[in-house]
A protein has these predicted regions:
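Alpha-helical scaffold segments that flank or form the walls of functional sites
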Residues: 72-124, 129-147, 171-180, 488-490
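N-terminal metal-binding scaffold of metallo-dependent hydrolase/deaminase domains
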Residues: 1-41, 51-52
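C-terminal cap of metal-dependent C-N hydrolases
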Residues: 427-484
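Active-site gating loops and adjacent loop-to-helix segments of metal-dependent hydrolytic enzymes
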Residues: 68-102, 131, 146, 159-160, ...
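Metal-coordinating catalytic core of metallo-dependent amide/deamination hydrolases
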Residues: 128-259
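Short acidic/histidine-rich active-site segments
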Residues: 217-224, 286-288, 296-317, 422-428
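C-terminal helical cap
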Residues: 8-10, 106-113, 283-285, 326-342, ...
């Protein structure tokens, strides 16, 4: 039995296109679109009441393991900079995760996303106390709600050689599982934390793993100035140059944030290619600055970085902060962590207490392996390079909506299905809203309606793979109230374990 959606304002996002019409869905795919479509015997016919119908949204960078962090107690010491936010909050949370919390966080995170019209999650997971099989737990939690996922495990040197090896193996194991399944519902990338917690030999191993599975690397890039500063201080290289030298900069990769890249770094990303995940609400929350997204010519998508699953809110934030920055009101980003601090603290950040530091040389490892050494830092880039990027171009509403659609383009590559399109042959991941515009809605002004008319509160029903996962605001795939009650109990236990983790 298929479905026919009639009397709908069909809204494609990239490029913006609005048509009044109907869709027919069968076997998980859109099979017909037009002013009217013929139903077949047994089809369910749904009158959308003249409301907006959109493709399902894709969260380009998230951490569903943070779902149970909402309302958690403050850390014992107030963070004073980005590194302390990681050390005192998120690295304590991820170490406190057990199997129950991992699966439940994924399920709750997926439920929150579903209610916001998000149908696919590109997730970056970390649980150093429970690594083996962790991605199976995340996948189960997401699948129980009916969403699609592109998953990875965060490889890092923070927990010493054993933790690093376990992270790489979890990525390999899950990549093998996904390559065997190829069902369009789940896929994988190679996960990496960030340059400043990864030694050279690990970058080589990650690139080799990506080569083995013909995929990309999902990594945080220049979220805070400390990432670039650490790279220049320890390796005499610019951050993007280091990632490129070891093969992590590639068209299949996802570079999250890119908040502090200068003009030459942006040009290199544009030239070689990667998909940049822009997370404006997280960047504001962590006070790390504003990414020069207007300068990117490579694909850009929106992510929430674990702040829920509401991409409508993320799009609006992206527009507002771009306006703020265009007016020059953002000001310089202050950080108490300067390059010189890294030599003083050694591997204190890269390796948490009890973990061994590898202390590899930036060039010797590749030379010993018969490869050429990465090019060292040879010149200092102008301090105004990034500033000119921020001020030179203003984003338009159409560009913001293009970023909103960007996650679907990237997820389509990994999953092997067409997402983000209301057209024949595309996956039937569809959001039915109750938004009946009270002003004219056209292809030209659709971005304005998305930014200032639509919101997640207007999401009424959601199809994923042609199945109703949310119908008239009722979750169909699981007992939502029971899951929320379970989550409240599990969150208390998680928070107690966090309190026992040393900062």
């Amino acid at each position: 039995m298929g479905q026919v959606l009639t009397n709908a304002l069909l809204c494609d996002l990239d490029p913006p296109r609005v048509e009044t019409g109907a869709l027919r869905i069968d076997a998980g795919r859109i099979v017909g679109r037009g002013p009217t479509v013929a139903s077949q015997p047994g089809d369910e016919v749904v009158d959308c009441g003249g409301a907006v119908v959109l493709p399902g949204l894709v969260n380009g960078h998230t951490h569903v393991y943070s779902a149970l962090a909402v309302g958690m107690p403050p850390p014992p010491k107030a963070p004073q900079n980005f590194l302390e936010i990681l050390k005192f909050v998120w690295w304590r949370l991820d170490r406190a995760l057990d199997a129950e919390a991992i699966e439940l966080s994924a399920r709750i995170g997926a439920l929150e996303a579903l209610r916001c019209g998000t149908t696919t999650l590109i997730d970056h997971h970390a649980s150093p106390s429970c690594i083996k099989g962790a991605l199976d737990l995340v996948q189960k939690g997401i699948a129980d709600v009916g969403l699609r996922g592109v998953l990875c495990y965060e490889t890092t040197d923070r927990h010493g050689p054993d933790g690093r090896a376990a992270g790489i193996e979890e990525n390999r194991r899950f990549l093998e599982r996904c390559s065997n399944a190829r069902d369009g519902r789940i896929s994988a990338l190679v996960g990496a934390h960030a340059s400043f917690t990864l030694e050279d030999e690990v970058l080589e191993q990650l690139a080799t793993l990506a080569d083995d599975f013909d995929t990309g690397v999902h990594i945080h890039v220049a979220e805070d100035p400390c990432d670039e500063e650490d790279c220049q201080h320890r390796y005499q290289m610019f951050l993007v140059d280091r990632l490129a030298a070891y093969g992590l900069l590639r068209p299949e990769s996802v570079f999250a944030h890119c908040t502090h890249l200068d003009g030459l770094a942006v040009a290199k990303v544009n030239q070689i290619g990667a998909t940049v995940a822009h997370n404006p609400r997280s960047n504001m929350n962590n006070a790390v600055g504003y990414a020069p997204v207007a300068a990117f010519r490579c694909p850009v998508m929106l992510g929430t970085d674990g702040i829920g699953g509401d991409l409508f809110a993320e799009a609006k934030a992206a527009w507002l902060i771009s306006r703020h920055e265009q007016a020059g009101l953002g000001g310089p980003v202050e950080t108490s962590t300067r390059a010189a601090d890294f030599s003083a603290r050694g591997d204190a950040v890269r390796s948490e207490p009890g973990a061994a530091a590898t202390g590899l040389d930036a060039r010797a490892g590749r030379e010993a392996a018969g490869g050429s050494a990465p090019s060292p830092l040879t010149s200092v880039r102008g301090s105004d390079a990034r500033g000119s990027l921020v001020a030179s171009d203003a984003l338009t509403p159409t560009q913001i909506v293009g970023m909103l659609a960007g996650g679907a383009r990237r997820a389509s590559q990994s999953l092997g299905v067409t997402l983000g399109k209301l057209e024949a042959g595309a996956a039937a991941d569809i959001v039915v809203t109750d938004y009946v515009p009270f002003t004219p809605l056209t292809s030209e002004n659709l971005p304005g309606h998305i930014l200032f008319g639509l919101s997640s509160n207007r999401v009424r029903s959601v199809l994923v793979d042609g199945q109703w996962r949310l119908r008239d605001r009722i979750v169909r795939a699981c007992d939502e109230q029971a899951e929320r009650a379970h989550a409240r109990e599990a969150a208390q236990r998680l928070w107690q374990r966090m309190a026992e983790v040393p900062a």
